[in-house]
Amino acid sequence: MKIGLMGGTFDPPHIGHLLIAEQAKEQLQLDAVWFLPAKLPPHKQSTVTSAAKRLELVRAAVRDNQDFSVSEIEFERETKSYTFDTIRELKRRYPEHAFFFLIGADSLVSLGTWHRSEKLYKEIEFGAVARPGSRYLIPEGARVTAVDMPLLEVSSTDIRQRVARGRSIRYLVPEPVRQLIEEWNLYAT
C-alpha cells in the first residue's frame, strides 16, 4: 500500500489539513493518509492544547473519511518527536508499505535543518503541497513530488485567534472539531 503521512501539531486540525490530505491522496495515488499528531513537537516550545485533546481533535476531524486514520506512534515516546525516528519506526513495523511524507512547500526551505535530514531524504519521498506565496525550493538529495491544491488561507493560529475574539470558525474546521472546541472551551481567553 502507498501511505501518505501527515505530521503536525494540529492545534486545531482544520479544513486545510483535510484538503491537503485529500489532494495528496488523489494526485500521488495513495491508498490512505495517516495523520501523525506530535505529542511533543520539536519545533515548538509549547502547545496551547494538551496532547491528549489534540489527539481527540484529529480523530474527530478524520472520522468521516474511511481513507484517513490517526496513528498514535508519536504518543509512544516520552521525548520530542522527530520525523526521521517516526519514519524509521513505521518502515520497521510496516515493511510492505511505501510511505510519502506530506509537507507544505514553504517547509521545504527548512527541511535541511530537520533532525538527521540527509538520512531522512534517503528514507522517504515527500509530497510537497503549495501554500499561498510559496515556491518549491527542493533541498539537494530530497525526493519531492509536487501536489497542487486550491490555495486556501486557513491556519490553526488564525482559528485560535478567532475563537479568542468570539468569532465563528464554522466551515474552517470540521463540525465535530468545532463542537469539541466549544465543549472544552478551547482557545477562549
Swiss-Prot record:
It catalyses: nicotinate beta-D-ribonucleotide + ATP + H(+) = deamido-NAD(+) + diphosphate. The keyword ATP-binding applies. GO terms for molecular function: ATP binding; nicotinate-nucleotide adenylyltransferase activity. Pathway: Cofactor biosynthesis; NAD(+) biosynthesis; deamido-NAD(+) from nicotinate D-ribonucleotide: step 1/1. InterPro entries: Cyt_trans-like, NadD/NMNAT, Rossmann-like_a/b/a_fold. Keywords: ATP-binding, NAD, Nucleotide-binding, Nucleotidyltransferase, Pyridine nucleotide biosynthesis, Transferase. This is Probable nicotinate-nucleotide adenylyltransferase. It comes from Exiguobacterium sibiricum (strain DSM 17290 / CCUG 55495 / CIP 109462 / JCM 13490 / 255-15).
